[in-house]
Amino acid sequence: MGEIQGPVRVRFAPSPTGYLHIGGVRTALFNWLFARHHGGQFILRIEDTDEKRYVPGSADDLMASLRWVGIEWDEGPDIGGPYAPYVQSLRHEAGIYRPFVEQLLESGHAYMSFTTEEELERMRAEALAGGVKAFRFRGPERDWSLDRQREMAATGRPYTVRLKTPTEGVTAFRDLVRGGERIEFRNEELYDIVLVKSSGMPVYHLAHLVDDHLMRITHVLRSDEWVASTPYHVLLYQAFGWEMPAFAHLPPILRQDGRGKLSKRTDDVAANRFWERGYLPDAMFNYLALQGWSYDGYTEIMSREELIERFTLDRVQPSPARWNPEKLLDMNGIYIRRLKTEQLADAIAPFLARAGLIGDPPTPDERAYLVQLTPLIHERLKELGEAPELLEFFFREVTLPDPLLLIQKKMDAATTVAALEAAHARLAPLEPWTHDRLEAELRALCEELGLKAGQLFGAIRVAVTGRTVAPPLFDTLVALGKSRTLRRLEAARAALTTHAGANVQS
């Protein structure tokens, strides 16, 4: 990529138009890793110049989503910095952009356009009807003198400010993700984009570029959907006479089937949804780092420190990444298994509290019990949000949806009732109530009853948990305790007796 001169400064500049897309988190992450790798600064800036699409509260949501993943900024809207404010609407109110608009008008690189939306639509329709494949608007006012433009504006007629694009030659830039490849656009294929709306609000193309210059941004890492807009940005840098930042356009993330990009409209890709479902920040951080970047082609599990050390743009692939929810789920499971018991207990506590199983925060007794239960699901858990369903029967009484679930293979209602009665009788006097004693007594009971372990253990499992699949049986019985175990065995026996009718002798 070449030697970087001076301190690296990058930015992530989302628009508060709703929840933060997971692809946006990936873009922020690549910026953050690049800055940290080079000992530079990562800046967060809110670009809210699109008043129609602005969603109140979404700026707070996107900051919370970034912080959840572990992305902190060195300058930003909530912590300030030397180039505050870091919200474009506030910068507009402060009059930051107006002098630069005047500079473009004075130099002839921009002009006031008085063409209305209705006129523009009519011109577009006529051009397309005439066989033009792509309508490229260049307003008649581009040839007016600035004095004439100002005279028209003085009459009160609404206007936008447009960039006066050249009609000949090419506009080019180099892209670091493509190995510094020179990307060219023929100027005749450009059009005069709007820089300032009729409301006076600057649009993204102008506002972000002025902000990048004033905030001394050295590298612009952004989605490759902005490649087509980059020639306009290059023309603006040239018009101002400013040094351009280095550009790196990141590959899109496709759906798992490869049919199109991940989309807010059709895919469950809100960053906060992964938070709510119980993905660990470290797992999401690791997985997103691999969405378009690879260290050596096979190493996948890497710590934040390793990713910072290894991340370089020459390892970012220009071809699209592909979203794989199963791989993310597996990676989350790996990170969950790396947690210590108390760490996992504390991580799942909010999910159990949300389900009404424990308090928020849990009492000391609740936390101690949760620490006891956590090893029972530690190896099985892939999302923290699965914990309430897996552990619910430890906190609430069991209601059998169908007593016939108690009956195991090659058993009937009568033998199942008898087995439950025998288990209750065998366990009632048992002391101490430990894993080894429970296993020894119940295995001995299997032999006495002529049952296979799976038959007796399966019936007991359903009786005490209400489900056919549950954590290891003897650990479960220890965690439930003697009194609850015996009570549930008796309740299950009674339920099956009632359900099966008079043919079952108690």
Curated annotation (Swiss-Prot):
GO terms for biological process: glutamyl-tRNA aminoacylation. The keyword Heme does not apply. PROSITE patterns: AA_TRNA_LIGASE_I. A motif ('KMSKS' region) lies at residues 261-265. Its main location: cytoplasm. A motif ('HIGH' region) lies at residues 14-24. GO terms for molecular function: ATP binding; glutamate-tRNA ligase activity; tRNA binding; zinc ion binding. Keywords: Aminoacyl-tRNA synthetase, ATP-binding, Cytoplasm, Ligase, Nucleotide-binding, Protein biosynthesis. CDD domains: GluRS_core. GO terms for cellular component: cytosol. It holds the Pfam family tRNA-synt_1c. It catalyses: tRNA(Glu) + L-glutamate + ATP = L-glutamyl-tRNA(Glu) + AMP + diphosphate. It is found in: Cytoplasm. Belongs to the class-I aminoacyl-tRNA synthetase family. Glutamate--tRNA ligase type 1 subfamily. Catalyzes the attachment of glutamate to tRNA(Glu) in a two-step reaction: glutamate is first activated by ATP to form Glu-AMP and then transferred to the acceptor end of tRNA(Glu). Monomer. This is Glutamate--tRNA ligase.
